[in-house]
Amino acid sequence: MWCNPIICALDTYDINHALRLTKMLYGKISMVKLGLEFFTAHGLSGVQAVSDCGIPIFLDLKLHDIPNTVGKAISVIKSLNIAMLTIHISGGRDMMLSAIDSIFGSMIKLIGVTVLTSIDDSDLKDIGIDRSSIQHVMLLSKVAQEIGLYGIVCSAFEVQEVRNQCGKDFKLVVPGIRFEDDYSDQKRVKNPKDAILAGADYLVIGRPITMSSDPIQTVDAILSSINL
């Protein structure tokens, strides 16, 4: 980890809000996450503006396309100061290998997306996947590690089993971190302490921080709850 496990998810198209929060949280968190909403609105220049604030960037684009397209997209993205970038493991081995080839010469770490935290077993069944969410995550995690990705994104419910399967050096990024009274649109979620105890390396936390009246106090409370 860079300094602590918290990645603040700036899920917004408002660049001024994103910059304000990034500057406020400098030195308090490990990274900020910029996703599709922000990237669609502001592109490479917007990512660069946030990066200029000095906090490492977790660019969560969940790339999923043919190998050549993903490779070329990453060749453009790697001009930015990005710490981690997400790609879908379900894009296949050739796509992931193309992504790995394309980050050569940069500091970018590739993180594989397994099963979104908004999806549960019934959703998987609807799209023709007969495995449970944890079985599917375990399968995809194994493939990602064999290919050579830096780590994966999974829910806190799968962390312990993935850790046992993949070992201590494979990084586990856990989104869907909520407090007990706020599960919103996420289905497979846990609170910060439970996620860390289960074996998470990074916690992606959005609204509990970004919608707080005092984001710094909220971050301090989260760190205190996990004894950091």
Curated annotation (Swiss-Prot):
Pathways per UniProt: Pyrimidine metabolism; UMP biosynthesis via de novo pathway; UMP from orotate: step 2/2
This protein's UniProt keywords: Decarboxylase, Lyase, Pyrimidine biosynthesis
Binding positions for substrate per the UniProt entry: 11, 33, 60-69, 117, 178, 186, 206-207
InterPro entries: Aldolase_TIM (IPR013785), OMPdecase (IPR014732), OMPdecase_AS (IPR018089), OMPdecase_bac (IPR047596), OMPdeCOase_dom (IPR001754), RibuloseP-bd_barrel (IPR011060)
GO MF annotations, alphabetized: orotidine-5'-phosphate decarboxylase activity
Recorded superkingdom: Bacteria
Catalytically driven reaction(s): orotidine 5'-phosphate + H(+) = UMP + CO2
EC number of this enzyme: 4.1.1.23
GO biological process: 'de novo' pyrimidine nucleobase biosynthetic process; 'de novo' UMP biosynthetic process
Active site per the UniProt annotation: 62 (proton donor)
Classification via Gene3D superfamilies: Aldolase class I (3.20.20.70)
GO cellular component: cytosol
Subunit details: Homodimer.
Protein family membership: Belongs to the OMP decarboxylase family. Type 1 subfamily.
PANTHER family for this protein: OROTIDINE 5'-PHOSPHATE DECARBOXYLASE
Function: Catalyzes the decarboxylation of orotidine 5'-monophosphate (OMP) to uridine 5'-monophosphate (UMP).
Protein name: Orotidine 5'-phosphate decarboxylase
Lineage of the organism: Bacteria, Pseudomonadati, Pseudomonadota, Alphaproteobacteria, Rickettsiales
